Amino acid sequence: MNLEDICFSLGADVPVFLRGSSSYAEGCGEILKDKYSSTSTYLLLIPNIFVSTAKIFNSKHLSFDKKLDKSKNSLLSALLLEDEMFKKHYFGLESLLGAHTFKKIKLSGSGSAMFIQDPDKEEIDIIFNKIENNFRVFQ
């Protein structure tokens, strides 16, 4: 067993951190493409809740399409059906941010962390001024 195999057994994102550089991960994190970079900026929104990755991947509501559709996150529907606290936080963002900004929110993986790619100044201001202590926000 090599170091990447050991890291993958600890968590799907660990091999990405092991490399120490930007990478693009596919599959469950085991397929890494070298030196992926983007000029995008991101706003990370993390609700102060715990979501079990194992619970989501074992959900009866989870289905995987044979053809990759990069416009959607196939874990979102399962997460909304499996975790009431996440559902409350997720739809709470819609009322705070409005439909336009809410549509830009994507999951970062199988947990509760979400992000907005290339947020504009107004969106950043709204998020920092309206989101209370139930989220951690990183820019």
Residues of each region from the PLM?
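Glycine-rich beta-strand-to-loop/alpha-helix junction loops that act as flexible
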Residues: 107-112, 118
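ATP-dependent small-molecule kinase catalytic core of the GHMP/sugar-kinase superfamily
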Residues: 2-104, 117-139
